[in-house]
UniProtKB/Swiss-Prot annotation:
Localization per record: Cytoplasm
Name of the gene encoding the protein in the UniProt record: aceK
GO biological process terms held by the UniProt record: glucose metabolic process; glyoxylate cycle; tricarboxylic acid cycle
GO molecular function, one term: phosphoprotein phosphatase activity
Family: Belongs to the AceK family.
Pfam families given in the database record: AceK_kinase (PF06315), AceK_regulatory (PF20423)
InterPro entries: AceK_kinase (IPR046855), AceK_regulatory (IPR046854), Isocitrate_DH_AceK (IPR010452)
Job of this protein: Bifunctional enzyme which can phosphorylate or dephosphorylate isocitrate dehydrogenase (IDH) on a specific serine residue. This is a regulatory mechanism which enables bacteria to bypass the Krebs cycle via the glyoxylate shunt in response to the source of carbon. When bacteria are grown on glucose, IDH is fully active and unphosphorylated, but when grown on acetate or ethanol, the activity of IDH declines drastically concomitant with its phosphorylation.
Organism (species): Salmonella enteritidis PT4 (strain P125109)
Protein name: Isocitrate dehydrogenase kinase/phosphatase
EC number(s) on file: 2.7.11.5, 3.1.3.-
Binding residues for ATP: A315, P316, G317, I318, R319, G320, M321, K336
Length: 583
């Protein structure tokens, strides 16, 4: 193979990444127009399209390499030299960290996820000392209350690129000042100032102004979700100023933001101050760089593993019928493998389960479905596997593992945020915490349904509780679109004996769901039943579900808020007209 071809291959890969990220920015830049035109279906389509861009461009590069090298690109030693040339191209490259992940993806596609070693891949960055380049233009702008907070906020809102009129800008400014005064105190407010990101963060039906509020006691988030009325007028729905609130807004159960970020590493570093609890992987995930987030997540896992003497164990909770789930006791993630054989009542294939997980990846998760990262040929050191888990792996997933002596290779798995299973949480809490959990569970079901998602299996064990007390769905093997379900009322019994029979007295077809039956397994606990009947009795009525289906089929897209209804300005301070119903 002629010398110089390695450099050509390296340049081809980098050019392929340039093309991918250019398209990524192109799709992202359309977010403002989609918001202004209230084209919510285009918002959903753009989200799916942007996710697919990465794999599409990896495939294009792989085909180019096979043509250029006449198939010899599968020679590992040759690609080692390609990596050396690629590394030399990165010091002057502005998105070097994601370009490294793109190289990894091309390599994995060529080698079918085999021979994944540090010398062949960018397992860790080639430039760890360089998180981001000198920024050619500021990411954010500072605003000081030299003449008071009212003119300061007027400048901020007036500087926004949105081309729609405001419903009542002065009113929104009064509400923001009222919130800041309540939060910080009237004396402290004049000594504070704000730094606001130049780009808006778009997601669902909102445009988020993201900023930092510098106070005498430190820096706080400053988040303003901007919505539009049905008449096309802008309004600020609330103001969020705590790290806990910001963490939920940027949470792992939400869709990725559309934010124009030609230098994503710089934006990640800027966000870190107001999201101190978020890892680098989570921040990249939040801004839509999900493939690089996977790289960062794997690095975080390796760093944890290197400093821990823990053993992998089966995850706490009721053992699943489809997935084998394990974890490290102190690690905040779980590892999920599709079993070789499912329980008899699970009439589905492994391909169906993978399709369900992909559906969740591409769909609006509305803060109620955990994001996952998919890995192939995942290597574990046997010495770090608890014997009980090792036995379980050999029993449940022998076709998914390869024994290499000191290591095993898991052919395919998902990594997901670890949560407390809701059924365990409900056993441990009482009083207001119990009430909050049941309210959260019902709200999760409602918000999923409004987003055209039916969980299928609604048992408490299939949901988890986050560190912020939010209830999130994480078992996807029976998930489907709401519009695919036939919600039915149970027909009246023909005879008294019918209700005692082991078989139903009515016909049941595939896709039939009888919401009345939910009551039997959601309200069996006497502590939970009355709370559920009080807050969520409508979930047991087929007409409730059919009404939601009608709204979905008519094209209605519900508002989903990343904060409590009571935090909305319309609830706290007064009505705002022409808004959709709160979730």
């Amino acid at each position: 193979m002629p010398r110089g071809l390695e450099l050509l291959i390296a340049q081809t890969i980098l050019q392929g990444f340039d093309a991918q990220y250019g398209r990524f920015l192109e799709v992202t830049s359309g977010a403002q127009q989609r918001f202004e035109q209230a084209d919510w279906h285009a918002v959903q389509q753009a989200m799916k399209s942007r996710i697919h861009l990465y794999d599409h461009h990896v495939g294009l590069v792989v085909e180019q390499l096979r043509c250029i090298t006449d198939g010899k690109s599968t020679d590992a030693d040759f690609l080692l030299r390609v990596k050396e040339h690629y590394t030399r191209l990165l010091p002057d490259y502005p998105r070097f960290e994601i370009a490294e992940s793109f190289f990894n993806s091309v390599y994995c596609r060529l080698f079918d996820h085999r021979s994944l070693t540090p010398e062949r891949l960018f397992i860790f960055s080639s430039q760890p000392e360089r998180r981001f380049r000198t920024i050619p233009r500021p990411l954010a702008k500072d605003f000081f209350p030299d003449h008071g907070w009212e003119p300061l906020l007027m400048r901020i809102l007036s500087d926004l690129p949105l081309r729609l009129p405001w419903q009542n800008k002065s009113r929104d400014i009064r509400y923001i000042i009222a919130h800041l005064t309540e939060t910080l105190g009237e004396d402290a407010l004049p000594r504070c100032h704000v730094q606001v990101a130049n780009e808006l963060f778009y997601r669902n039906k909102a445009a988020w102004l993201v900023g930092k509020l510098t106070t005498p006691d430190g820096t706080l988030p400053f988040l303003l979700p901007i919505h539009r009325t049905d008449e096309g007028e802008l309004f600020v729905d609330t103001c969020l100023t705590t790290t806990a609130e910001a963490s939920i807004v940027f949470g792992f159960a939400r869709s990725y933001f559309m934010v124009y970020a030609p230098l994503p590493a710089a934006l990640v570093e800027w966000l870190r101050e107001i999201l101190p609890g978020k890892t680098t992987a989570e921040l990249y995930m939040a801004i839509g760089c999900q493939k690089h987030a996977k790289t960062e997540s794997y690095r975080e896992y390796l760093c944890y593993l290197a400093e821990s003497d823990e053993k992998f164990i089966e995850a706490p909770g009721i053992r699943g019928m489809v997935m084998l789930v394990f974890t490290l006791p102190g690690f905040d993630r779980v590892f999920k493998i599709i079993k070789d054989k499912f329980a008899p009542q699970k009439e589905m294939s492994a391909a169906h389960v993978r399709a369900c997980y992909q559906l969740v990846k591409e769909h609006d998760r509305v803060g109620r479905m955990a994001d996952t990262q998919e890995f192939e040929n995942f290597v574990l050191d046997k010495r770090q596997i608890d014997p009980a888990l090792m036995a379980l792996l050999r029993q449940e997933v022998p076709e998914k593992i390869t024994d290499l002596g000191e290591h095993i290779v898991i052919r395919h798995l998902y990594i997901e945020r670890r949560m407390v299973p809701l059924n365990i949480w409900l056993e441990q809490v009482e009083g207001q915490q119990l009430r909050d959990a049941i309210e959260e569970y019902g709200n999760a079901i409602r918000q999923l349904a409004a987003a055209n998602i039916f969980p299928g299996d609604m048992l408490f064990k299939n949901f988890g509780v986050t560190r912020h007390g939010r209830v999130v769905f994480y078992d996807y093997d029976e998930i489907c679109y709401m519009t695919e379900v036939n919600f039915r009322d149970i027909p009246p019994a023909r005879y008294p004996e019918d209700e005692l029979a082991s078989e139903p007295w009515y016909s049941v077809s595939p896709g039939d769901v009888f919401p009345e039956e939910f009551r039997h397994w959601l309200c069996a606990d006497p502590r939970i039943g009355p709370l559920f009947e009080e807050m969520h009795a409508d979930l047991f009525r087929a007409d409730y579900w059919r009404a939601l289906q009608t709204r979905i089929k008519e094209g209605h897209v519900e508002d989903v808020y990343a904060y409590r209804r009571r935090q909305r300005f319309s609830v706290r301070y007064g009505a705002i007209s022409s808004t959709a119903n709160s979730s």
